[in-house]
A protein has these predicted regions:
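N-terminal secretory/targeting leader peptides
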Residues: 20-115, 125, 134-135, 140-337
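Sec-dependent N-terminal signal peptides of Gram-positive bacterial secreted proteins and lipoproteins
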Residues: 2-21
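Short, Φ-rich (hydrophobic/aromatic) sequence segments
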Residues: 8-11, 120-123, 326
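Generic cytosolic/nucleocytoplasmic N-terminal low-complexity/intrinsically disordered segments
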Residues: 1-2, 303
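Signature of the catalytic double-stranded beta-helix
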Residues: 120-132
Length: 337
């Protein structure tokens, strides 16, 4: 089965190699992402498509491929590197391989609040320094999407770190996320997002960690009936572009694509809160998921993993400046309360 998947991806890559091909005189621009067509990220990308085609419709046709149709995020990043795909939405954990600075987003309890998280991410001038860190790899982030707050969910209630002891939990393929779960005395199981449902269903893992949309959009609420708000990470998704494609654009066209990216983020942010509330309603009413909030000992979770901050800073000097910047924003927002 694995061989067939690899062959299919290879065939897709070959088929996409002519990505710069024209249809009716228009340059085809392909965007890959892992989410369903109802997901806020897809809605944001539809706004991206509409804006580009309204302004440059005589030159470009935007094609969006949801649901990992062109492969997992990691595979799609590799295709974006080669130019077989022009854009891909990827988690920061997928970008750590190419630029060490992205590891910081896997640091647990990095942002003191959602207000801090958004203040940092919306500081475009500062974030562009981070975005350019992958230039040598052949791609660059052009904007971010809110991927919410990551929490644990599984087959049994999780209220304290002790409830995770001995459990096998799916995490993103990030060393920091693996270390975090180990700090809770659980076994980390890095795997592709598309494998999680079956892994929980078959008892290969006991749970996972993600935002609430995973329960409904990816049907995880059918196999995991307890969702606990321990709030260990706020991790954005990134819209990544092939650098050669960006550099091939005229100044005027580049500006349109830049505006389209910013618009896609705004649409995604506007849709996010509505989607979360709807996901919670569906998960609770239709899937029987229990949401555990006030009974979760967030501070106990936090104290278990705070030593990871020092460990990560010692092992990766490239995150130091960004870490200090975030701490400054933490203090600034706290002081303004």
């Amino acid at each position: 089965m694995k061989k067939l998947t690899l062959l299919a991806l290879s065939a897709a890559a070959v088929g996409l190699t002519g990505c710069a091909s024209l249809t009716g005189g228009k340059r085809i621009v392909r965007i890959s992402h892992a989410q369903a067509e109802t997901h806020p990220e897809h809605l944001g990308l539809l706004a991206f498509k509409e804006y580009v085609e309204e302004n440059l419709g005589d030159k470009y046709e935007i094609q969006i491929f949801p649901n990992e149709l062109l492969g997992s995020a990691q595979k799609a990043i590799e295709l974006t590197q080669t130019g077989a795909i022009d854009f891909v939405v990827a988690g920061t954990a997928n970008l750590e391989t190419f630029a060490d600075v992205y590891e910081i987003f896997s640091m647990p309890y990095l942002f003191d609040s959602e207000e801090v998280y958004k203040a940092v991410m919306q500081d475009t001038d500062y974030m562009e320094r981070i975005y350019e860190s992958t230039d040598e790899a052949g791609f660059r982030v052009v904007t971010w999407y809110n991927a919410g707050t990551r929490n644990f969910y599984g087959k049994s209630p999780i209220k304290t770190p002790e409830d995770l002891k001995g459990k096998k939990i799916r995490v993103q393929q990030s060393p920091a996320s693996v270390a975090m779960v180990k700090a809770f005395d659980a076994a980390a199981a890095p795997m592709g997002f598309g494998e999680v449902y079956t892994a929980i269903q078959q008892g290969v893992i006991d749970g996972a960690e993600n935002n609430e949309l995973a329960l409904t959009n990816n049907k995880h609420g059918e196999v995991a009936k307890y969702y606990s708000y321990n709030k260990h990470q706020m991790v954005p998704d990134m819209l990544v572009a092939n650098l050669k494609f960006l550099n091939s654009l005229s100044d005027e066209d580049y500006q349109i694509f830049k505006e389209a990216a910013a618009l896609s983020t705004q649409v995604e942010l506007d849709e996010w809160e509505k989607s979360i509330e709807e996901a919670k309603r569906i998960a609770e009413d239709d899937m029987g998921v229990e949401f555990i909030d006030v009974d979760v000992d967030v501070d106990a979770f936090k104290q278990k993993v705070l030593p990871l901050h020092d460990t990560m800073l010692q092992e990766n000097e490239k995150i130091r400046d960004f870490y200090d910047h975030i701490q400054e924003v933490n203090q600034k927002v706290k002081g303004g309360e």
